[in-house]
Amino acid sequence: MAGCCSVLGSFLFEYDTPRIVLIRSRKVGLMNRVVQLLILAYVIGWVFVWEKGYQETDSVVSSVTTKAKGVAVTNTSQLGFRIWDVADYVVPAQEENSLFIMTNMIVTVNQTQGTCPEIPDKTSICDSDANCTLGSSDTHSSGIGTGRCVPFNASVKTCEVAAWCPVENDAGVPTPAFLKAAENFTLLVKNNIWYPKFNFSKRNILPNITTSYLKSCIYNARTDPFCPIFRLGQIVADAGHSFQEMAVEGGIMGIQIKWDCNLDRAASHCLPRYSFRRLDTRDLEHNVSPGYNFRFAKYYRDLAGNEQRTLTKAYGIRFDIIVFGKAGKFDIIPTMINVGSGLALLGVATVLCDVIVLYCMKKRYYYRDKKYKYVEDYEQGLSGEMNQ
């Protein structure tokens, strides 16, 4: 208890003030200068040169539009001879910061609403009506069960459903991809950026790009790094994947546009940098529900006025355009803050040297005696002398 009171009394009634002591020691002097040089190197090299601590920064605000071009031809028993242009394989026509290119499909033509046998699987195969439930439906059903067991073909019976008939059979994905020629389609990406804090705007179609150049150029990281037109096959290849393999079941590709701009330099130095990566990277050891697909339908009426539709299960590659970056420009406030922080860090050298001199060196008691001078309360000493 007495020890606690002594510590509390020392804390409340004692005051220490810095005392400058010049210590002639090569070790301590050299260590002090080395620490100071390291701190200066950090402040100048890292904070100001590398991180540009003298600049105010702002994040990019971006808008993106895309346009695909390319024509393909197919000739199949189901669809016959057919030409595919942009209006056929870009579904939907417009998306926000992305574009879907259909590369493969399962087409079910001339569907009408009625009753028909379900596709055979472990839940739909039956022997009699007793195996089928009226009104049954689950997430994998093509329609609503009628309770009847009907022939699917000469050897198999399945439960009948009320649905769009004939029901879709998506058991096998076409290989190779139906629109494998999409590898040579091109994609124009138009990107406008704005840094609101500095009221600076620019677009990826640079001022030196002419109309004739834009009609003929294709992006190449070495020869045409600022051409905004990309060949789809090259995008996938630059990400380290095969377009023909990806086109079968689809996937998602990221086109990354990086804008890092130093606005203390001329605006012509603010340039886009493109990179590519697959966003739905496949795990070969756990390949469940791979790729990217969805369904859409085209509705029409036959000569008798009955509604029909053609259902398409579309597989393809969705290209997501991801824009990021920051801009910096000189500002006195962050400059002074970082200068002040650097000066404060120089005090670390003094603290470190004090710890070594006063607690680690052989002559620490001698140095401690020179460093600290203990002075009694002058008023108490004076009153004691008067009482005597």
UniProtKB/Swiss-Prot annotation:
- Detail which positions bind CTP: 67, 69, 186, 293, 295, 313
Subcellular localization, as worded in the UniProt entry? Cell membrane; Lysosome membrane
| Alphabetized GO MF terms | ATP binding; ATP-gated ion channel activity; extracellularly ATP-gated monoatomic cation channel activity; ligand-gated monoatomic cation channel activity; purinergic nucleotide receptor activity
Cited InterPro entries:
P2X4_purnocptor, P2X_extracellular_dom_sf, P2X_purnocptor, P2X_RECEPTOR_CS
Look up and give the membrane topology term: Multi-pass membrane protein
Q: Name one GO biological process term.
A: vasodilation
Please write the reaction equations for the catalytic activity of this protein.
K(+)(in) = K(+)(out); Na(+)(in) = Na(+)(out); Ca(2+)(in) = Ca(2+)(out)
The UniProt record describes its induction as:
By immediate ATP release following TCR stimulation.
**Similarity comment text for this entry:** Belongs to the P2X receptor family.
What this protein is called in its record is P2X purinoceptor 4
Q: Which organism is it from?
A: Mus musculus
List S-S links within the chain: 116-165, 126-149, 132-159, 217-227, 261-270
Residue numbers on the Extracellular membrane side: 55-338
- Which UniProt key words apply to this protein? ATP-binding, Cell membrane, Disulfide bond, Glycoprotein, Ion channel, Ion transport, Ligand-gated ion channel, Lysosome, Membrane, Nucleotide-binding, Receptor, Transmembrane, Transmembrane helix, Transport
Describe its function: ATP-gated nonselective transmembrane cation channel permeable to potassium, sodium and calcium. CTP, but not GTP or UTP, functions as a weak affinity agonist for P2RX4. Activated by extracellularly released ATP, it plays multiple role in immunity and central nervous system physiology. Plays a key role in initial steps of T-cell activation and Ca(2+) microdomain formation. Also participates in basal T-cell activity without TCR/CD3 stimulation. Promotes the differentiation and activation of Th17 cells via expression of retinoic acid-related orphan receptor C/RORC.
- Phenotype caused by lack of the gene: Mutant T-cells show decreased Ca(2+) microdomains directly in the initial period after TCR stimulation. In macrophages, an attenuation of P2X7-induced cell death is observed correlated with altered cleavage of caspase-1/CASP1 and a decrease in IL-1beta production.
Q: How does it assemble?
A: Functional P2RXs are organized as homomeric and heteromeric trimers. Functional P2XRs are organized as homomeric and heteromeric trimers. Forms heterotrimer with P2RX1. Interacts with P2RX7 (via C-terminus); this interaction is functional only in the presence of ATP. Forms heterotrimer with P2RX4; functional differences between homomeric P2RX4 and P2RX4/6 heterotrimer are minor. Interacts with AP1M2.
